[in-house]
Amino acid sequence: MTSVFEAGPRDVSLGSRMLVERSGERMGTLGDADLDDIVAEYAVAAFERHATETAYVTEGGLTVRSTPGATAVYIEVVESKPVFFIVGGGHIGRSLSKLANFLDFHVVVLDDREDFANVERMPEADEVICDDYEAAIDRYPIDANTYIVMVTRGHKQDEVSLRRALGRGAGYIGMIGSKRRTSTVIQHMTEEGFDPAELARVHTPIGIDIGAETPEEIALSIMAEVIMLRRGGTAKSMYHRATSPRS
């Protein structure tokens, strides 16, 4: 949703609104065809950042820096909760479910064992699925707002799940495992003819290196990577070492 709150030099009404879909389709107008085109193009890109922003439009184009005399447009990204699809209900999957719920994701947990896929074990999950990995992933609606992590009990189950998730347009796919093991899986699938570009999008080994050892710490490293990619972060420390001025 976009709306004008400072008209600037353009003959537009304050509060005029235009709805822009992720596809670029529009409903309504801000009152100026040129302004509509500029803002719509920027609004589509805002979906990728999942961010609400203010844009300033001048004769020279659009900027996010406050500019006196510009037409100011508020761009609000309205979308459903991102789906965090956890494949594997073990210790790491359980920790991920708790953390993803806390971070306001729609949490889905899949495991093929009843003892691991139940609401008593996963009370924070919005959906708990006990089914064959291949069948369940095939059925589940996956799109750019879906974040998938493979943390099953073994590399065989991870690879099976990865095969079904590839090429579905997920916003993120990650697979746990050592560098050696995951490299073997990727190489095997490459030799079988899977799209190299799709395989290159798989984050494996998964997570950010924070020295994680416990299931909770590993879950934190995985979620940190997801948030970094979702928000366009760098994972660099924001710590700044203060230095005393030289005497």
Which functions belong to the PLM regions below?
Residues M1-D112, E120, I129, Y140-Y147, ...:
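Segments forming oxygen-rich coordination pockets for charged ligands
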Residues I92, Q157, R181:
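Hydrophobic/small residue at the entry helix of a nucleotide-binding pocket
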Residues E114-F116, R180:
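Helix N-cap at the beta1-alpha1 junction of Rossmann-like dinucleotide-binding domains, i.e.
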Residues N118-E124, I186-E191:
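Active-site-proximal loop->helix
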Residues D126-D132:
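Conserved SAM-binding strand-loop segment of SAM-dependent methyltransferases
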Residues T152-H155:
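N-terminal glycine-rich "phosphate-gripper" loop used for MgATP/nucleotide binding
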Residues A170-G171, I176-S247:
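Adenosine-phosphate binding glycine-rich loop
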